[in-house]
Each structure stands twice: as C-alpha cells, then as structure tokens.
Amino acid sequence: MEIKTNRLCIRRVNRSDVLHIRELNKNDNVNDFFGSVPEADRAEAFRDSNAVEKLFTLMESNLDTDNDIFYGAWKNDTLMGFIAIVNPTSHTPGIQIEIAPAYHHKGYGYEFLSAILKHLFETESFTYIQYLVMPTNAASIALVEKVGGALQKPGSFIEKLLIRVYHITK
C-alpha cells in the first residue's frame, strides 16, 4: 500500500525503516533534545531519557502483529512523520500522530492525517477512530477539529483536566 499526496509518499512502516531511523538517531542528539525541552512542554511519553529508543522498540515489536499499525510519511525520501493506529481490530481503535518539528505549521500533519483517514475509512473498512489529545496541545486539537473530529463529553472531572477525547467517523 502506498498513498501519494501532493507532497508526501505514505506507506506502512517496515522493519528496515525502523532500523534506518534507529541508526540515524543512534547518537544522543534526539534524547538530548528531549532533555532540553522544559518538562511541562514534553509529552508524557518523552519524559524518559530513553523515550526515543523505547518508541523504536515498540514500533519494531509490533510490526508483525495486529496490535498497532504504523504508517510513515516521506517527503523527498525523508521521513517527516508517522501515524500509529492503536488497537486496530478493537471496537475503539485509536490514532496517534507525530510530525517532525521542521514540518510543523506547514499543513503536512493535515495532509498526512487526511490521507490516512481516507485510506482507513474507504479501504480498511474502519467506521470510527478515537483521537486522544492533551488539553494544552492546541496544534493537535486544531488538527483533529480540521479533519472533523467531534469532542466527546468528559467521563469525569479528572478526564476533563488531563485529556480530550475526539471521535472521528467516516
């Protein structure tokens, strides 16, 4: 499966992609970068100093399973982001997106997410996807709302403080 957009080539991430990305990030630059970002601005997943390596390990371990599906978006042979479909066979599959900082605020996230949603709804027979976002992540909230995500009423006060749940339907 390969999806071409105006600026991107999108496909499932394979083992050699993960190994290549891991090799590119083998030095401590990426972990150093996350260490230099103020803790309040770092996503929970990246508060650990080895978060990037753990992410690659998770991606690699799930490549041959139905647990999660990873899609990458390449621009001119450079991986600019990935999308993970979490629990794709469940009744409440989730979606997560990461875009490299150099591509922020240029429409790449929308282009990538829109293409993947179209693929999931039209080709993979998905009818519903859940998108979780921190209330302070304005860019992610704007992105999910732009693709038609509907904010769900929080189930608890704690949920209201910590997370926003959006539903994206076909």
Predicted segments, located by residue:
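GNAT-family acyltransferases
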Residues: 1-101, 160-170
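Structural motif
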Residues: 28-29, 124, 148
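Small side chains
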Residues: 72-73, 109, 149
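Conserved beta-strand-loop-alpha-helix junction that forms the acyl-donor binding cleft
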Residues: 100, 131-141
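Conserved acetyl-CoA-binding loop-helix of GNAT-fold acetyltransferases
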Residues: 105-119, 138-146
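Conserved GNAT acetyl-CoA-binding A-motif
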Residues: 122-132
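Conserved catalytic-core motifs of GNAT/GCN5-like acyltransferases
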Residues: 132, 148-165
